[in-house]
Regions:
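Short intrinsically disordered, low-complexity coil segments enriched in acidic
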Residues: 1-11, 18, 55, 108
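Consensus "Asn ladder" position of solenoid repeat domains
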Residues: 1-4, 26-29, 49-52, 58-59, ...
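C-terminal capping segment of individual leucine-rich repeats
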Residues: 2, 14-17, 39-41, 70, ...
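Conserved hydrophobic position(s) of the canonical leucine-rich repeat
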Residues: 6, 21, 31, 44, ...
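The feature encodes a structural signal of leucine-rich repeats
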Residues: 9-14, 31-37, 61-67, 84-90, ...
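Surface-exposed loop/turn motifs in large extracellular/passenger domains
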Residues: 15-22, 40-45, 70-75, 123
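Leucine-rich solenoid repeat scaffolds
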Residues: 85-142
């Protein structure tokens, strides 16, 4: 569903109508809010929602999807190239591939997954200039 100028998903786009949905890529669309409809799917493993822009090219996805870490089978979230701001959610090692790169205003605490990052069991894709706290194993410029 990439490159379609979508602003929302249909009401039919949910776990009960798509029970075998494993991967969902909504990148390069126009979502200003994270679509939560498919998150209850027991099969969903990866969501990509990178590069959400309005018609003028402005970054419009600013809010972290609250509750994303409780999605039952999600292991990968690609939410880079947006304008995500403060992340108030505690990360879990269940979601072990996280792309937050090119979110210049992000502020996130990764203390809860630092031991997994250090052990190579959690892949955080980030920029060295981002406000990422709680893990000295990362090469962050302050």
């Amino acid at each position: 569903l990439r490159f379609n100028k979508l602003t929302r998903l249909s009401d039919d786009f949910r776990a009960t109508t798509l029970p075998y949905l494993k991967n969902l890529d909504l990148s390069y669309n126009c979502f200003s809010k994270f679509p939560t409809e498919p998150l209850n799917s027991s099969q969903l493993q990866a969501i990509g929602i990178r590069f959400q822009r309005d018609a003028d090219g402005n970054r419009i996805l600013r809010e972290w999807p609250t509750g994303i870490t409780t999605c039952p089978s999600l292991i990968q979230l690609q939410i880079g190239s947006n304008d995500i701001r403060k992340v108030n959610e505690t990360l879990t090692s269940q979601l072990y591939i996280l792309d937050i790169k090119d979110n210049p205003n992000i502020s996130i605490d990764v203390t809860s997954v630092c031991s997994d990052i250090r052990a190579g069991m959690y892949k955080l894709i980030y920029d060295k200039t981002q406000d990422i706290r709680g893990c000295d194993a990362l090469d962050i410029k302050r």
